[in-house]
Amino acid sequence: NGYPHFSISLCAKIDDEIVSAVVIDPIRREEFSAFAGGGANLNNNKIRSSKQQSLIDAMLSFKKSKDKNYDFGKSHKELSNQNLNMRESGCISLDLAYVGAGRLDGVWGYDINILDIAAGALIAQEGGALTSNFLGDPKYINGNNIVVSTAKIYKSLLKSIKPYFKG
């Protein structure tokens, strides 16, 4: 449909830890990168996640799921009732990098493939965002769900999503 929101993502994993990552947006000529413990960059300039403190004022993105273990419909309705600013871009790897750069304040997804999130998640973490699975465990790497956001809204976002997860 001519919607130019996609990326190329690569990462290196040692044991169960992502140690380096790159997410490339070829349309905008942007390269997000990170090394574990080394911060995150956009086109070789340091980036940081936003300082957003309120979930109601946050810009959020999500990945829809039809999996029976997560009631996406009820979750989305609950968050919509809070009048949150939400969107689905269709490219979770780029959305995660956007959290690291402060363009988005939070992202969550269920029924995802680790290959779609590993690089972007490290960039978000190294940019200062918090990352976990839907149960709040920071070891999201072995699961199929993720919550990433700025530190100040993380607990509120997780609390809004968690009741609809049956895992």
Description of each model-found segment:
Residues 1-38, 58:
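DPxDG-like acidic metal-binding loop motif
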Residues 4-6, 45, 82:
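Short beta-strand or tight-loop elements
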Residues 15, 43-44:
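Short strand-turn-strand beta-turns centered on an Asx-Gly dipeptide
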Residues 31, 44-45, 51:
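A short, polar/proline- and glycine-enriched secondary-structure boundary/capping micro-motif
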Residues 38-40, 129-130:
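Short beta-strand segments in beta-sandwich/barrel cores
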Residues 39-43, 60-62:
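Hydrophobic/proline-rich hinge and linker segments of small-molecule sensing/allosteric domains
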Residues 48-167:
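An extended, acidic
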